[in-house]
C-alpha cells in the first residue's frame, strides 16, 4: 500500500515541478490552474496522511520557480511567499477558526479584502523615494532583476511624493488589462507574431524581456498590494488597509476594490459581490484574498513553509478546465462565416456545464495543432463563448483524427470562399443559404436597399421561421391573406404591407445591386457599379479586371462580386427576383446632377439641424462628391454638426477643413 502511495506522491511531485517550471520560468503553462490546484491538493492530502513519505523538496514547500540565468539574481530580504487556498465557504470558515484559536482571543478579527489579480508578482524597491530596483518573486527567496522593464510600466512611479521611508519595498501585481490584451493579440495576429493564451502569460512574458524597449510597448498595469522591507525608523499604521491607502498617497496605484470587514459573513458577502462583478472588471481575477488587517496580529500568527497563517485566497470557480474533443461541427453564421465548433465531453467550467467550444477558424486549428480525440484546455469567461485555448499533447491518445475543413457549406452546399489575408471562411450562397436567410432578407428590405415600408425585423423573422420565404423573391409571392395571419397584423396592415412590397417592383439598378448584399458592396459602390455597367447582365458577366476599372472597386471587392454571381444558387435567386423587379436599363443609376464636386471626398459627423445626414449625403453626391464614413488624409473636408466626436478630433489633427452647417449650405448653393 505504502509503495503505491509513495509512487503516486513521486508522480505528483514530478508533474507539479514541471508545471511550476512552465508557469513561473517559461510563462507558458500547459495545464489550467484548476488542474494544477487539483494535483497540488492531492499531494498535500497524501503528505498529511503519510508524513513519513513527504519529501523535503516537495512542491508544497516551495514558492514559484528559480530565477533564470539571463537575469541578475536578487535576494529578497523579506521572503515573497505564496498563499494557501480555500475553495469553499467551509474551508474559509476553517481558516478563520484557526486564526482565532492561534490568537487565543475573543476580540473581533478584522479582515482586509482584495481581489486576487491573475498576473505576475513583482517587488519594487524605493530608496529616498526613488525607484532603484524591480524584481520578480522567483522562488520566494530570490528573484530576477527586471528594473529596466518595470520602469517602462506607465503607472509605476519612478519617484514617490510626500514623506516616504528611507527604504521602502512595495509588492504588487503586474497585469495586462483585458481590453488591451485583446487589442495586443489582434495586432500580433495581423503581424503573424506570437499571440498569448491569456493576460497572465502576456504580463509575465512582457516583464522578462531582455530588451526593455519591447516591454515598453506592452500595455501593462501595476497594482500595489503589500509592503515588504521598510526602514526600521518608519512609523506606519497598524492596519494593512491603512498602509495601502498610505501607498496611494505616496503615488502608488492601489486597487479601488479593497475594503475591510469584521466577520466571516462579511467576507462571504464580499466574495459573492466580487464574483458577481468578475466579468465587468477590466482585468483577470481568480479569487479574493482575505488578510488579517492588524499588522501586530499578523506578526503573532507568523508563517508556515510557503505561506502566511494570516492570509488565504478564496478561489473562484475555475474558468479553465481539461476535457476531450469528441468531434467538430461547422456552424454557419448570419453573415456566412464558417466557424468550427468542438464537441466536448461535458465539463463544469466556471459553474456552467460546457459541451461545446469554438475553434474560431482554420488558422486557429492549425496554430493549436488540435485533433479530434485530444485532451484540451477549455476557457469560459463571463458571456464569452467557451473556447479551446491549448492542447495537452502529452496526453494525446494514438487514435486521434485530423480536423478537415469543409469545401462546401454544410447548410446549403454552396462553395466556401476564403479571401487571401482573411482568417474567416465564408459560404458564398448568401441569398440562398438558410443560415443567412434572415439577415439577407432584412438587408434586402432595408431603407437604403429596396425600402419596403412596414417590413420590420420581427416580421421577417416570423416569415422565415414559418418557412414562408426562403429567398427575397418569395416576398413578392406573399398574399394578403397569408400576411393577415401573422401576430398583430390584421387585414388592413396586411394590405398595407402587400402594397409596400408591390411598390418596390419598380426600382433602380443601384438599389437592386445594393439589396443583393454582396460582401463589401455598399451603397456608394453599388451606385458606381450601376453607373459603369448600365445593366445587370453586363455586371454579372464582368471579370475581375473589368470590375477594377470602376472607382473604389479593388481586387478584394472584385473577387467578392465575381464569387457572388458565379455561385449557382445566387444566380437562381437573382433570376427569380428579375421576374418581379424592373428598373430603367441603360440609364445613369445615380442622382448626380453636376460634377462640380467631382474628386472631392467629404465625411459627415454630429447632428445637423437643417437637414438629416442622409439628406446632406445625397446633396453632396448629387454634385459629384464622394461621402465616406471615416476620416483620412484623402478627406477633402469634414462636415461637423453638434456633438461631433472623434472624427472631428482626427480631422483637426490632420489639418483638414471643417465645415459647419452654414458653410455646407454655401457649398451646396454655389
From Swiss-Prot:
Keyword vocabulary terms for this entry: DNA damage, DNA repair, DNA replication, Ligase, Magnesium, Manganese, Metal-binding, NAD, Zinc
Residue ranges of domain BRCT in the record: 592-670
Pfam families to which the protein is assigned, alphabetical: BRCT, DNA_ligase_aden, DNA_ligase_OB, DNA_ligase_ZBD, HHH_2, HHH_5
Binding residues for Zn(2+): 409, 412, 427, 433
Enzyme Commission number: 6.5.1.2
Requisite cofactors: Mg(2+); Mn(2+)
Superkingdom in the source lineage: Bacteria
Residues reported in the UniProt entry to bind NAD(+): 33-37, 82-83, 114, 137, 173, 291, 315
The UniProt record lists the keyword Repeat: no
GO CC term, one of those recorded: cytosol
TM regions (residue ranges): none
GO biological process: DNA repair; DNA replication
Reaction equations catalysed: NAD(+) + (deoxyribonucleotide)n-3'-hydroxyl + 5'-phospho-(deoxyribonucleotide)m = (deoxyribonucleotide)n+m + AMP + beta-nicotinamide D-nucleotide
Task performed by this protein: DNA ligase that catalyzes the formation of phosphodiester linkages between 5'-phosphoryl and 3'-hydroxyl groups in double-stranded DNA using NAD as a coenzyme and as the energy source for the reaction. It is essential for DNA replication and repair of damaged DNA.
NCBIfam families the UniProt entry points to: dnlj, PRK07956.1
PANTHER family found in the cross-reference section: CHROMOSOME TRANSMISSION FIDELITY FACTOR 18 (PTHR23389), DNA LIGASE (PTHR23389:SF9)
Protein name, entry field: DNA ligase
Organism: Idiomarina loihiensis (strain ATCC BAA-735 / DSM 15497 / L2-TR)
Amino acid at each position: 500500500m505504502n509503495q503505491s502511495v509513495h509512487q503516486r506522491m513521486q508522480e505528483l511531485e514530478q508533474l507539479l515541478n514541471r508545471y511550476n517550471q512552465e508557469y513561473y520560468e517559461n510563462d507558458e503553462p500547459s495545464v489550467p490552474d484548476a488542474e494544477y490546484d487539483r494535483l497540488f491538493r492531492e499531494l498535500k492530502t497524501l503528505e498529511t496522511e503519510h508524513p513519513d513519505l513527504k519529501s523535503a523538496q516537495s512542491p508544497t514547500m516551495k514558492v514559484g520557480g528559480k530565477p533564470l540565468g539571463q537575469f541578475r539574481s536578487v535576494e529578497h530580504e523579506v521572503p515573497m511567499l505564496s498563499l494557501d487556498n480555500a475553495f469553499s465557504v467551509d474551508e474559509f470558515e476553517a481558516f478563520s477558526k484557526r486564526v482565532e484559536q492561534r490568537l487565543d482571543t475573543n476580540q473581533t478579527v478584522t479582515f482586509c479584502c482584495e481581489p486576487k489579480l491573475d498576473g505576475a508578482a513583482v517587488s519594487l524597491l524605493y530608496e529616498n523615494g526613488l525607484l532603484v530596483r524591480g524584481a520578480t518573486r522567483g522562488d520566494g527567496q530570490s528573484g530576477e532583476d527586471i528594473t529596466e522593464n518595470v520602469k517602462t510600466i506607465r503607472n509605476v512611479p519612478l519617484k514617490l511624493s510626500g514623506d516616504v521611508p528611507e527604504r521602502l519595498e512595495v509588492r504588487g501585481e503586474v497585469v495586462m488589462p483585458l481590453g488591451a490584451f485583446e487589442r495586443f493579440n489582434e495586432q500580433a495576429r495581423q503581424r503573424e507574431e506570437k499571440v498569448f493564451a491569456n493576460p497572465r502569460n502576456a504580463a509575465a512574458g512582457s516583464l522578462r524581456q531582455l530588451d526593455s524597449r519591447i516591454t515598453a510597448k506592452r500595455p501593462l498595469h501595476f497594482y500595489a498590494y503589500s509592503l515588504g522591507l521598510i526602514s526600521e525608523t518608519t512609523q506606519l499604521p497598524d492596519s494593512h488597509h491603512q498602509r495601502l491607502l498610505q501607498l496611494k498617497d505616496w503615488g502608488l496605484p492601489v486597487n479601488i476594490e479593497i475594503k475591510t470587514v469584521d466577520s466571516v459573513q462579511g467576507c462571504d458577502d464580499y466574495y459573492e459581490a466580487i464574483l458577481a462583478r468578475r466579468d465587468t472588471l477590466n482585468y483577470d481575477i481568480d479569487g479574493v484574498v482575505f488578510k488579517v488587517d492588524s499588522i501586530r496580529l499578523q506578526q503573532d500568527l507568523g508563517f508556515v513553509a510557503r505561506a502566511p497563517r494570516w492570509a488565504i485566497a478564496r478561489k473562484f470557480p475555475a474558468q479553465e478546465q481539461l476535457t476531450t474533443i469528441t468531434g467538430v461541427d461547422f456552424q454557419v453564421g448570419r453573415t456566412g462565416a464558417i466557424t468550427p465548433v468542438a464537441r466536448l465531453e461535458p465539463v463544469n467550467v466556471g459553474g456552467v456545464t460546457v459541451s461545446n467550444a469554438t475553434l474560431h477558424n482554420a488558422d486557429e486549428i492549425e496554430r493549436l495543432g488540435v485533433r479530434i480525440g485530444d485532451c484540451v484546455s477549455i476557457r469560459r469567461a463571463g458571456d464569452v463563448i467557451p473556447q479551446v485555448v491549448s492542447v495537452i499533447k502529452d496526453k494525446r491518445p494514438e487514435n486521434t483524427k485530423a480536423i478537415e475543413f469543409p469545401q462546401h457549406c454544410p447548410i446549403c452546399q454552396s462553395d466556401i470562399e476564403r479571401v487571401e489575408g482573411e482568417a474567416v471562411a465564408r459560404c458564398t450562397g448568401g441569398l440562398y443559404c438558410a443560415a443567412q436567410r434572415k439577415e439577407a432578407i432584412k438587408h434586402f428590405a432595408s431603407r437604403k436597399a429596396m425600402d419596403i415600408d412596414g417590413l420590420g425585423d420581427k416580421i421577417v423573422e416570423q416569415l422565415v421561421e414559418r418557412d414562408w420565404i426562403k429567398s427575397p423573391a418569395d416576398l413578392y409571392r406573399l398574399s394578403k391573406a397569408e400576411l393577415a395571419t401573422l401576430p398583430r397584423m390584421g387585414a388592413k396592415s396586411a394590405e398595407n404591407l402587400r402594397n409596400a412590397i408591390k411598390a418596390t417592383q419598380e426600382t433602380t439598378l443601384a438599389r437592386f445591386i445594393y439589396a443583393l448584399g454582396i460582401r463589401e458592396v455598399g451603397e456608394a459602390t453599388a451606385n458606381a457599379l450601376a453607373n459603369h455597367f448600365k445593366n445587370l447582365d453586363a455586371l454579372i458577366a464582368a471579370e475581375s479586371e473589368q470590375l477594377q476599372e470602376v472607382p473604389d472597386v479593388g481586387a478584394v471587392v472584385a473577387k467578392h462580386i465575381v464569387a457572388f454571381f458565379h455561385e449557382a444558387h445566387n444566380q437562381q435567386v437573382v433570376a427569380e427576383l428579375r421576374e418581379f423587379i424592373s428598373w430603367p436599363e441603360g440609364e445613369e443609376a445615380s442622382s448626380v446632377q453636376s460634377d462640380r464636386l467631382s474628386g472631392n471626398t467629404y465625411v459627415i459627423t454630429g447632428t445637423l439641424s437643417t437637414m438629416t445626414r442622409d439628406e446632406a449625403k445625397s446633396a453632396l453626391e448629387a454634385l459629384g462628391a464622394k461621402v465616406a464614413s471615416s476620416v483620412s488624409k484623402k478627406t477633402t473636408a469634414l462636415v461637423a454638426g453638434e456633438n461631433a466626436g472623434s472624427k472631428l478630433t482626427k480631422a483637426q489633427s490632420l489639418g483638414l477643413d471643417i465645415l459647419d452647417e452654414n458653410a455646407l449650405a454655401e457649398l451646396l448653393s454655389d
